[in-house]
């Protein structure tokens, strides 16, 4: 992949998402489940947010036999504190129906993972059963982050605010983020930089729930995260394995 390719892909994702937003219509919201991502992650010494996704721009198709409800139930049985569900269709093969189906079947918080650019997507997430949403600092203005945090809170949802640098982490803190995800995958290059977790987590105060994202491939990776953050979000590792239960046990 050329150095310019990742930049182009990210721009394409944002452009596609902006066009999707224009087509969002009304919906009948699911009952509010009253589940808190923050509380769930803080209830254990170290927590796992396990992810459901069919494919990704960096890895291509991850799971041909993709059954998100079945996968999510397996995660819950294994001890996940929360579930992340990709709802982007074009680049990750997800859907809002996946979010709705998973939220309806589980008793733990479910995070809508998507490229949130507009308030209507937050209301949409709530309508389809999400307990939390992902906000990516790199693609939002400070004003948007503050506004989206406030709106999500008013709807009874938490926000996982994703950062990639210490500067982005400072911005997230200034905007009022309480759960900060440190993504070791650079969105501009799609490369993994594990040292980012140590660098950025050291910058965050103890009252912030810290989540390490991306790059978990083996037990030693997870052990590193345990020393630095409160939780890990793991997706590709599980999705690439035919036997999720065995993959989980191999990590722990």
UniProtKB/Swiss-Prot annotation:
Pathway field of the UniProt record reads:
Amino-acid biosynthesis; L-tryptophan biosynthesis; L-tryptophan from chorismate: step 4/5
InterPro entries (alphabetical): Aldolase_TIM, Indole-3-glycerol_P_synth, Indole-3-glycerol_P_synth_dom, Indole-3-GlycerolPSynthase_CS, RibuloseP-bd_barrel
Which keywords appear in this protein's UniProt record, sorted alphabetically?
Answer: Amino-acid biosynthesis, Aromatic amino acid biosynthesis, Decarboxylase, Lyase, Tryptophan biosynthesis
The UniProt GO MF terms for this protein read: indole-3-glycerol-phosphate synthase activity; phosphoribosylanthranilate isomerase activity
EC number in record: 4.1.1.48
Pfam families to which the protein is assigned, alphabetical: IGPS (PF00218)
Q: Does the record's keyword annotation contain Lyase?
A: yes
Database matches in CDD domains = IGPS
> Which reactions appear under catalytic activity for this entry?
1-(2-carboxyphenylamino)-1-deoxy-D-ribulose 5-phosphate + H(+) = (1S,2R)-1-C-(indol-3-yl)glycerol 3-phosphate + CO2 + H2O
Q: Which GO terms describe its biological process?
A: L-tryptophan biosynthetic process
Family annotation (HAMAP family): IGPS_B
The similarity annotation says: Belongs to the TrpC family.
Protein name in UniProt: Indole-3-glycerol phosphate synthase
Highest classification ranks of the organism:
Bacteria, Pseudomonadati, Spirochaetota, Spirochaetia, Leptospirales
């Amino acid at each position: 992949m050329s150095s310019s390719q990742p930049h182009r892909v990210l721009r394409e994702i944002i452009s596609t998402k902006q066009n999707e937003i224009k087509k969002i219509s009304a919906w009948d919201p699911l009952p509010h489940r009253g589940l808190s991502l923050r509380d769930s992650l803080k209830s254990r010494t170290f927590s796992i947010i396990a992810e459901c996704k069919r494919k990704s721009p960096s890895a291509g198709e991850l799971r041909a036999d993709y059954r998100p409800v079945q996968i999510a139930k397996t995660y819950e049985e294994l001890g996940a504190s929360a579930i992340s569900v990709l709802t982007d269709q074009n680049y990750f093969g997800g859907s809002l129906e996946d979010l709705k189906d998973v939220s309806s079947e589980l008793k733990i918080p479910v995070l809508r993972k998507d490229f949130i650019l507009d308030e209507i997507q937050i209301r949409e997430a709530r309508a389809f059963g999400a307990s939390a949403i992902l906000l990516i600092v790199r693609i939002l203005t400070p004003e948007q982050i503050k506004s989206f945090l406030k709106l999500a809170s008013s709807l009874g949802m938490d926000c996982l605010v994703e950062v990639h640098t210490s500067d982005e982490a400072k911005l997230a803190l200034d905007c009022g983020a309480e759960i900060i995800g440190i993504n070791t995958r650079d969105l501009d290059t799609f490369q993994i930089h594990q040292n980012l977790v140590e660098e950025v987590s050291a910058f965050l105060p103890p009252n912030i729930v810290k989540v390490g994202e991306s790059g978990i491939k083996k037990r030693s990776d997870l052990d590193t995260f345990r020393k630095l953050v409160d939780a890990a979000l793991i997706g590709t590792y599980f999705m690439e394995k035919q036997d999720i239960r065995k993959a989980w046990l191999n990590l722990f």
